[in-house]
UniProtKB/Swiss-Prot annotation:
Domain of life: Bacteria
Family annotation (PANTHER family): LEUCINE--TRNA LIGASE, MITOCHONDRIAL, LEUCYL-TRNA SYNTHETASE
Gene that this polypeptide is encoded by: leuS
Family: Belongs to the class-I aminoacyl-tRNA synthetase family.
EC assignment: 6.1.1.4
UniProt keyword terms in alphabetical order: Aminoacyl-tRNA synthetase, ATP-binding, Cytoplasm, Ligase, Nucleotide-binding, Protein biosynthesis
Compartment list: Cytoplasm
Protein name as catalogued: Leucine--tRNA ligase
Cellular-component GO terms for this entry: cytosol
Location of the motif 'HIGH' region: 66-77
Protein's UniProt keywords contain Manganese: no
Organism: Corynebacterium glutamicum (strain ATCC 13032 / DSM 20300 / JCM 1318 / BCRC 11384 / CCUG 27702 / LMG 3730 / NBRC 12168 / NCIMB 10025 / NRRL B-2784 / 534)
GO biological process, one term: leucyl-tRNA aminoacylation
Record's keyword annotation contains Isomerase: no
Residues spanned by motif 'KMSKS' region: 722-726
Length: 952
């Protein structure tokens, strides 16, 4: 083992920023040179060379990895990274084998946009940003196993992203078994007739191309002509999650239009029930669980068939008991039957003008209406604002009473939820009521209890006006019974069926970009998709000069995507042998979305250099497999602690769970879930400043005068906001490390408040953390001579009480990620020692302190540990334990109240009886002064807390 101070000049004796920087650099080199934080695997190239068995007790702690775009980190970014490092270091001291590393999520739109702005290739920009971020993170002293670090842009990594894509592509979801199965197991079921094709055709009677299509209809990855979010300004399609509520791109703020395109989709909806139900297995916050449940949006109800001009229009409703109140129908403007029904539509002659949107015919009205909503996002369409729509010129038949009801299209109905059509019950639905009121449509009460003249009645009540002559009468029934009876009648008459619907939609899995994982898919001359064999992976991005996306006029809704990879003709047009001789193929020119690499990266951390597998299952089982003996019988397995922001609750986390479940179904992993425990850290906030236009100005250039703030002479407004580039209030960690030291930054960020809450940054307060470390240093090192100030001496009882209570509290706080209170307890203990031992100090009092400090301030702890005669790192020193006998007081002090006011204090034995406590209170001189000559009415003892005497 190398020693970081061997061969160096004597250190300065005072703990200054200069000394801190020197110590920190030396110990960081020591950790790197000695592989201090390297965690061994059971098998493979990271297994112990001597064959030594691994500890059964392990910990896999993981951060949500960063996006290496822009100008690097600000002090808000390391908050979670420092916290996980503290937790990992503490657990190493408990004897656990700890896996902690950090990679880079380097593909995707942010990196590409930044590269476009700077005029350099995304790879060049990304690698430079990664190196800068590595430097910044390295300066913080994070205890990462650098051998396990990955970047999603490394071909060695995305080879396996492509491989996992192919596993999903070559799978189908067996609804009966509720799991993914290989496509090879599907074909025999289609051939035998045990499973039907999606369109009901006889599989064996189909030609080869039709058979392939029948199989493709079952795949978990498929191409679909679907309505997507097309952003001409970015030149790509966006997922719903990447579109803001006002219908603009989250990145770049460009208009987004709804457009029908053929796109790769992942059938995440097949896993809706498991994604909801398995949340109960996870140690996640209820907030995140609720967000995922709401995003998936499971609703129980019925599908009901309405007849319209010879066509069947199926609606989904959670309230089939209100069918008698359905007075009109609404289809989403994109519904596939709209154009079919338009061909059968009548004229607008005699039609209410409010229904026509000022147009002469249904066809013209529909075209104009569709154009008017093209730029609206789903969220914008569902906002509570004035309802709009147009009459389709046809009528539908209400199946329960035979009423002819008008059929409209309106933007508040979406194709992605339910069936894209609704039965409108305005008396008992607020949106339907608003629509009916605006357009003058009938409103019929079918649930008693409200006043439909004033508003929709949406609460529960008995059914009224709800009977027909065909065997259905639910009048007088409560909601649940009425629903059940209506569904039973619908199924008996073959007019509907009970069912479950979800808000969740299949995952749009393609982008028209350059900087992403290429698809391992080629197309033959007939346009049929073929998966590439494993031997042809990775499909690497071609080197191209023109990597910029083909962007369009941001307002050009009629533009068509043109992926930049399509320009690389030599790469696109290939001749391959896929098992039946060489043939010409065309590569897919889309790339995967930014979420692909982050959907599985924790598994590559486990086995980062395995060339044969994405992750050896023996290594996966050790690090993430279920441990029912530790975590309970229903433990799903997964990473032991995953720390990151709550903003990823329904994006990354949902996608990662989906991919992991497919891998579990196919037998590639032993864990059912990717992340056993999730912890959402808060944010570091800082003052931000806006000028009279509301534009943010650089916080560093703002001056304060007489309580007001000025930028270039103009008064500006001060506000708090999340630290970042957009608010121009970022503080670089480099500056804090240079001016105070990394340990000071670590202590300050951990002491600012509970980890799961946001906290304000104030550079002027950092000095408080520095002073704490200086006091710690002075306990051990004489600032004048550099001599060590410890001596061999038995601790006093008071010393032992302070030490063991500190150990007990700190252990509990570290275990529960209450690092801010760890710092508070350590400060209290240092203050006690400083006051008690102004000259020299017993080694037995300070050695445990250094170990307790080391997870938070590892560099100074290592240096002091070495000064006290140790040759090895403090990293694996067993964490101090406490003795119970020092946690309880022999004597306690109790306040004594007389008629509710404290009049004295007494000291009694901790186990004193109530009678002994009263006797001591009455004997106290100050208390006697208050009760002398008065009658003692009542005496109350609150054990361990206080004594109250009532006199008169």
């Amino acid at each position: 083992m190398t020693n970081p101070s061997e061969g160096t000049t004597p250190l300065a004796f005072r703990y200054t920023p200069e000394l801190a920087n020197k110590i920190e650099g030396e110990w960081q080199n020591y950790w790197t040179d000695n592989g201090t934080f390297n965690a061994p695997n059971p098998v493979g190239d990271l297994a112990p060379a001597d064959g030594k068995a691994l500890p059964e007790d392990k910990l896999f702690v993981q951060d949500m990895f960063p996006y290496p775009s822009g100008a690097g980190l600000h002090v808000g970014h390391p908050l979670g990274y420092i916290a996980t490092d503290v937790f990992a270091r503490y657990n190493r001291m408990l004897g656990k084998n700890v896996l902690h590393t950090l990679g880079y999520d380097a593909f995707g739109l942010p990196a590409e946009q930044y590269a476009i702005q700077t005029g350099t290739h995304p790879r060049t920009t990304t690698m430079a940003n990664i190196e800068n971020m590595k430097r910044q993170l390295g300066a913080l002293g994070l205890g990462h196993d650098s051998r396990r670090a990955v970047a999603t842009t490394d071909p060695e990594f995305y080879k396996w992203t492509q491989w996992i894509f192919l596993q999903i592509f070559n799978s189908w979801f067996d609804a009966e078994q509720q799991k993914a199965r290989p496509i090879s197991e599907l074909i025999p079921l289609l051939e035998s007739g045990e499973l039907k094709t999606k369109d009901g055709a006889d599989y064996n009677a189909l030609g080869d191309v039709e058979k392939q299509k029948a199989v493709d209809d079952y795949r978990l990855v498929y191409r679909s002509n679907s309505t997507v979010n097309w952003c001409p300004g970015l030149g790509t399609v966006l997922a719903n999650e990447e579109v803001t509520a006002d219908g603009r791109s989250e990145r770049g703020n460009f208009p987004v239009f709804r457009k029908n395109l053929s796109q790769w989709m992942m059938r995440i909806t097949a896993y809706s029930d498991r994604l909801i139900d398995d949340l109960e297995l996870l140690d996640w916050t209820e907030k995140v669980k609720s967000m995922q449940r709401n995003w998936i949006g499971r609703s129980r109800g019925a599908e009901v068939d309405f007849s319209a001009e010879g066509e069947t229009v199926t609606v989904f409703t959670t309230r089939p008991d209100t069918l008698f109140g359905a007075t009109y129908m609404v289809l989403a403007p994109e519904h596939e039957l709209v154009d079919v029904l338009l061909e059968k539509a009548g004229s607008y002659e005699g039609v209410d003008a409010r229904w026509t949107n000022g147009q002469a015919s249904p066809a013209e009205a529909v075209a104009a209406y569709r154009a008017s909503i093209a730029a609206k996002s789903d969220l914008e369409r569902q906002e509570n604002k004035e309802k709009t729509g147009v009459f389709l010129g046809v009528y539908a038949t209400n199946p329960v009473n035979g009423d002819q009801i008008t059929v409209f299209i309106a933007d508040y109905v979406l194709t992605g939820y339910g069936t894209g059509a609704i039965m409108a019950v305005p008396a008992h639905d607020e949106r339907d009521y608003e629509f009916a009121t605006v357009l003058g449509l009938p409103i019929k009460e079918v649930v008693a209890g409200g006043n439909i003249e004033e508003a929709a009645f949406t609460e529960s009540g008995e059914a009224v006006n709800s009977a027909n002559d065909n065997g259905l009468d639910i009048n007088g029934l409560a909601k649940d019974e009425a629903i059940a009876k209506t569904i039973e009648w619908l199924e008996e008459k073959e007019l509907g069926r009970g069912t479950i619907q979800y808000k969740l939609r299949d995952w749009l899995f393609a982008r028209q970009r350059y900087w992403g994982e290429p698809f391992p898919i080629v197309y033959d001359e007939n346009g049929q998709a073929h998966a590439l064999p494993d031997s042809m992976l990775p499909v690497e991005l071609p080197e191209v000069e023109d990597y910029k996306p083909v962007s369009f006029d941001p307002e050009d809704a009629d533009s068509e995507p043109s992926p930049p990879l399509a320009k690389a003709r030599e790469w696109v047009e290939v001749e391959l042998d896929l098992g039946d001789g060489k043939k010409k193929y065309t590569r897919d020119t889309n790339v995967m979305p930014q979420w692909a690499g982050s959907s599985w990266y924790q598994l590559r951390y486990v086995d980062p250099s395995n060339d044969e597998q994405f992750c050896n299952i023996e290594n996966e089982r050790y690090w993430t497999g279920p441990r029912p003996e530790t975590h309970g019988p229903n433990d799903p397995g997964g990473v032991d602690l995953y720390v990151g922001g709550v903003e990823h609750a329904v994006l990354h986390l949902l996608y990662a769970r989906f991919w992991h479940k497919v891998l579990f179904d196919l037998g590639h992993v032993s864990s059912k879930e990717p992340y056993r425990r999730l912890y959402n850290q808060g944010y570091i906030q800082a003052f931000a400043y806006t000028d009279s236009r509301g534009v943010y100005v650089p916080a560093d250039d703002v001056e304060e005068k007489d309580g007001k703030f000025f930028y270039q002479g103009e008064e500006v407004n001060q506000e708090y906001g999340k630290m970042g580039k957009s608010l121009k209030n970022a503080v670089a960690p480099d500056d804090i490390c240079n001016n105070f030291g990394a340990d000071t930054l670590r202590v300050y960020e951990m002491a600012m408040g509970p980890l799961d809450t946001s906290r304000p940054w104030a550079t002027k307060d950092v000095v408080g953390a520095q002073r704490f470390l200086q006091r710690l240093w002075r306990l051990v090192v004489d600032e004048n001579t550099g001599e060590v100030l410890t001596r061999d001496e038995v601790l006093t009882d008071d010393d032992n009480k302070q030490l063991h209570r500190t150990i007990a509290g700190v252990r509990d706080d570290y275990t529960n990620l209450r690092v801010n209170t760890v710092v508070a307890k350590l400060i209290e203990y240092v203050n006690y020692l400083t006051k008690t031992y102004p000259d020299t100090i017993p080694a037995g009092a300070v050695l445990p302190l250094i170990v307790m400090v080391s997870p938070i301030a590892p560099h100074i702890a290592e240096e002091l540990w070495k000064k006290l005669g140790h040759d090895d790192t403090v990293t694996y020193e067993p964490f101090p334990t406490f003795e119970e006998k020092w946690l309880t007081d022999d004597e306690i002090e109790l306040p004594v109240q007389v008629n509710g006011k404290v009049r004295g204090r007494i000291t009694v034995a901790a186990d004193a009886s109530q009678e002994q406590v009263i006797e001591a209170a009455l004997a106290d001189e100050k208390v006697q002064e208050q009760i002398s000559g008065k009658n003692l009415i009542k005496q109350i003892v609150v054990p361990g807390r206080m004594v109250n005497l009532v006199v008169k």
